Amino acid sequence: MSMFLDTAKIKVKAGKGGDGMVAFRREKYVPNGGPWGGDGGHGGNVVFVVDEGLRTLMDFRYHRRFKADDGEKGMTKGMHGRGAEDLIVRVPQGTTVRDADTGKIITDLVENGQEFVIAHGGRGGRGNIRFATPKNPAPEISENGEPGEERNLELELKVLADVGLVGFPSVGKSTLLSVITAAKPKIGAYHFTTIVPNLGMVRTKSGESFAVADLPGLIEGASQGVGLGTQFLRHIERTRVILHVLDMSASEGRDPYEDYVAINNELETYNLRLMERPQIIVANKMDMPEAEEHLEEFKKKLATNYDEFEELPQIFPISGIAHQGLENLLEATAELLEKTPEFLLYDESDFQEEEAYYGFNPDEPEFAISRADDASWILSGDKLEKLFTMTNFDRDESVMKFARQLRGMGVDEALRARGAKDGDIVRIGKFEFEFVD
């Protein structure tokens, strides 16, 4: 049986911006030509695109790293380097993307053709033509390209079924699916026969069609990961209608009503919104001895939880193996689907807030200072490290510009306040220099 892979961890890296160029106009009859170095091109983005033709995340099992191309370097004559093409990564419909480092949901990809930029490419570094001023008409300054965004991601694929079959193991879900659809699930008289979702399409006599998922068997404690646990619950989140299958024969000595309550408790514990989905109770194995008596007892117990103004869930007595009562069940399911809207999987607060990629966050410190064991000073911080990465250290003027930027950020004053002395070693990454007081 082919394996259904519904989670995958991958790494994406957008392209680096191309380096800016230092060049000067040197042409006959053009004395003292000015700066002519162009900007680097923009690095490629990594873009997720929903492809309804994909059904699993299996491809990501063998291909876990995705890197977009870098932008081209700037050229002479003030010409910009070519920007890199975006890297398109196709994902199945229904993929949820999380930040693997924080666990926060980044996006939920549910519409065919939907696009989402998951990693932004770096901007190109500026060439020396951009740094010309009246005081410095021939600057030997250029910038390196900005690094592309890099992210560790976790992908989750939830079964895109309209209807989910839930119930304790071996209540007859797989048999029911096999007789109402063309699906061929593995069927057996032991717990956890179904360990991955089985999908099938139903077409009623009236012409309605919908997708049904026979989901892995559930036991008490699933919301805490017992048994197949949260794997099961993850698959049911997308279904709009739940068919709650119960074994009315009580052949294993179980009480159908206790099973019904236990499974609903697990659904509610995992995600309160799961209980908002309408349920149809499927009283299965009605061809077995004493099933009628068990069903009547179940109805009495169920009624005690509802007052006279509340509507009880619909109950359909069937026998999957004997093909009894199926037509009425399917017509009622199609009718309920027709009037049931799609459910949001998460509250809006679960999603990461969109921020401008190059935006300024005033609450975020621009740099941090720490002391190494060898008494050197260590500078760190996203903004500072970005400036460092984009500095062309092959050019003296670029190095001097970087030093001015550090002073403008208050690095010199902060080092002095921490006790830095003339000649102390200061490090940024692998680069080191002497502090001059």
From Swiss-Prot:
Location of the OBG-type G domain: 161-338
GO molecular function per UniProt: GTP binding; GTPase activity; magnesium ion binding
Residues given in the record as GTP binding sites: 167-174, 192-196, 214-217, 284-287, 319-321
Residues annotated as domain Obg: 2-160
GO cellular component terms, semicolon-separated: cytoplasm
Location of this chain's protein in the cell: Cytoplasm
Cofactor: Mg(2+)
Record-annotated OCT domain positions: 359-437
Family annotation (InterPro entries): G_OBG, GTP-bd, GTP-bd_Obg/CgtA, GTP-bd_prot_GTP1/OBG_C_sf, GTP1-OBG_CS, GTP1_OBG_dom, GTP1_OBG_dom_sf, OBG_GTPase
Broad class of enzyme this protein falls into: hydrolase
A GO BP entry: ribosome biogenesis
Binding site for Mg(2+): S174, T194
Keywords from the UniProt entry: Cytoplasm, GTP-binding, Hydrolase, Magnesium, Metal-binding, Nucleotide-binding
Domain of life: Bacteria
EC numbers, comma separated: 3.6.5.-
Pfam family, one: DUF1967
Protein's UniProt keywords contain Metal-binding: yes
Stated role: An essential GTPase which binds GTP, GDP and possibly (p)ppGpp with moderate affinity, with high nucleotide exchange rates and a fairly low GTP hydrolysis rate. Plays a role in control of the cell cycle, stress response, ribosome biogenesis and in those bacteria that undergo differentiation, in morphogenesis control.
Description of how the protein assembles with itself and partners: Monomer.
Family to which this protein belongs: Belongs to the TRAFAC class OBG-HflX-like GTPase superfamily. OBG GTPase family.
UniProt protein name: GTPase Obg
The organism of origin for this protein: Streptococcus suis (strain 05ZYH33)
Gene: obg
